[in-house]
UniProtKB/Swiss-Prot annotation:
This is Teratocyte protein CftICK-I. Abundantly expressed by teratocytes, which are extra-embryonic cells released by parasitoid wasps into their hosts during larval eclosion. It comes from the Eukaryota. GO terms for cellular component: extracellular region.
Length: 52
């Protein structure tokens, strides 16, 4: 039971880490941020970019 609980926590952390590797569409992004999940980082104005 103890090992199962540890395994479950490891899986959750792995999923969270993978989820943070990309930015959802319509969210702010930059050249140093993770890549967009779908599409590219598109400039909206001078200092504002969103994933499109």
């Amino acid at each position: 039971m103890y090992k199962l609980c540890i395994l479950f926590l490891v899986v959750i952390f792995a999923v969270m880490a993978i989820a943070k590797e990309c930015i959802p569409s319509n969210q702010q992004c930059s050249t140093i941020s993770p890549p967009c999940c779908s599409g590219n980082c598109v400039l909206q104005g001078k200092h504002f970019s969103i994933c499109a």
